[in-house]
């Protein structure tokens, strides 16, 4: 399917979901908790966190850590959940404006338990992304790159389909790699901030798609003939799966493709 085909299906499904809304307060609370666990698990697992979905659930719901697991993995889990909660709050604002402070706050909440001094702060040195020839900007270039990024994000809003905009925000933040660590998780939170604000479902990229996810990012970052088509398609396909999951939970019948 082409990107346009995928976006049309997304909008068809979104119309069905909108017709079912609004949810009750209890349903919203249940849904938020469901995605809080699922997104925290999947986003961390993409980065090598060893906690399983069940272990993530026990830690977040009961505060019980699993013996033998690295303490950092536990901090990543609780930190991501805090950042997720904040992301939801601002995503539901009618006057959302994505600024550097918004992005830095997401990173701060995720990373503060791991390294308080680096949380929410732009990196001071060069970073490298394993498995790719792409090299992120030098540390001294990061502030200017971020200013340009948030400006472009505002300019593209209304011109791109919300799913394309969310994919762009995700991919571009990973390109810049503004923080010492935690860039991927911050990028996925930013992506979902845009999706939720525009009435779409939360996207969790399952660990089983890690290879496809990395390859799609690499295609967008390559020096010769870069293309973000595969990455946008991947995010669009994940959005469709999220919509199907949403409809399954609420027994909503979707139109046949």
Where are these regions (language model features)?
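FIC/Doc superfamily catalytic core
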Residues: 1-257
